[in-house]
From Swiss-Prot:
Keywords: Calcium, Endonuclease, Hydrolase, Membrane, Metal-binding, Mitochondrion, Nuclease, Transmembrane, Transmembrane helix
Biased composition (Basic and acidic residues): 253-271
MF terms (GO), sorted A to Z: endonuclease activity; metal ion binding
Gene: lcl3
Protein name in the entry: Probable endonuclease lcl3
Length: 271
């Protein structure tokens, strides 16, 4: 006797329908080329390839200059946070692709390190393109006038801030030469241009390695205006400074300073 509440007839009919619509083992090849199967497979493949490409193009972090592909130069920009300012025209950048939109600074696994040991081999050494700032004391050379002021000015402008670097090339010191922008309030500022306007840098004058992008004329005009306005290193010494022995002639440019020291060091070498 059939159990009155079992519903066996309904379950049996449902099972029969499922088996009737299920493909037989011999039908699998034809099932794989059905439009709905092909569309689903194509959609999965396209989304996977697009995701990988999106990651490699926009979200892959570049820890050091050795990880920059040659075809990136003059085509890509790098967004990140300045972790240190070593000199008046270069700094260290921790690359944060995608910025806050990608979770940097917000998600626990996307925190920017603060300890020096955690930043080892994790930052890019950026050289600001198109400008040359007064040299700090190093390698036994004396500091140039206004080198500390220029260094302090750059620290105040970019240290611990997010910047975007439009990368041009890798130089002989494994630095990335780049035009750098920083946002202050609602405005985006060209760091090199602002240094020239403040009279704390000159246009880069080396015979080789100069990089300006499309702004060389603008940079030269900014330097000339700073000279004419007597700001920064171009300011005339006060009476007190002159009495204290400050030079009254035009200041030595960073390029002249380097040339003078390089010539003196060559004379010291034997032979």
């Amino acid at each position: 006797m059939r159990w009155p509440w079992s519903g066996d007839d309904h379950e049996q009919n449902k099972s029969s329908r499922l088996w009737a619509t299920s493909p037989k083992s011999s039908d699998w090849p034809s099932t794989l080329v059905e439009p709905r199967t092909l569309i689903a497979t194509l959609a999965l493949t396209v989304s996977t390839v697009a995701g990988v490409r999106l990651y490699k193009t926009y979200l892959r972090r570049i820890p050091t200059v050795n990880h920059i592909k040659p075809n990136y130069f003059r085509r890509k920009s790098l967004f990140g946070q300045v972790t240190s300012v070593g000199d008046a025209d270069n700094f260290r950048l921790y690359h944060t692709p995608g910025g806050r939109i990608a979770g940097w600074g917000l998600l626990p696994w996307k925190r920017i390190p603060t300890k020096r040991e955690d930043l080892t081999k994790q930052t890019l050494h950026i050289r600001i393109a198109g400008v040359d700032a007064p040299e700090l004391a190093h390698w036994g050379r004396e500091a140039q006038p206004f080198s500390k002021e220029a260094h302090d000015w750059l620290i105040n402008l970019i240290h611990n801030r997010r910047v975007r670097a439009y990368i041009y090339r890798r130089d002989q010191y494994d630095r990335v030469v780049a035009q750098v922008y920083v946002r202050r309030w609602l405005f985006r500022k060209d760091v090199g241009l602002e240094m020239l306007r403040a009279g704390l840098a000159t246009v880069y004058e080396a015979k080789t390695g100069a990089e300006f992008g499309t702004v060389e004329d603008k940079y030269r005009a900014a330097e000339q205006k700073a000279r004419d306005s007597k700001v920064g290193m171009w300011a005339k010494p006060t009476l007190r400074q002159r009495l204290g022995g400050a030079p009254t002639q035009p200041p030595e440019s960073p390029r002249e300073y380097k040339n003078r020291h390089n010539a003196a060091e060559k004379l010291k070498k034997p032979g």
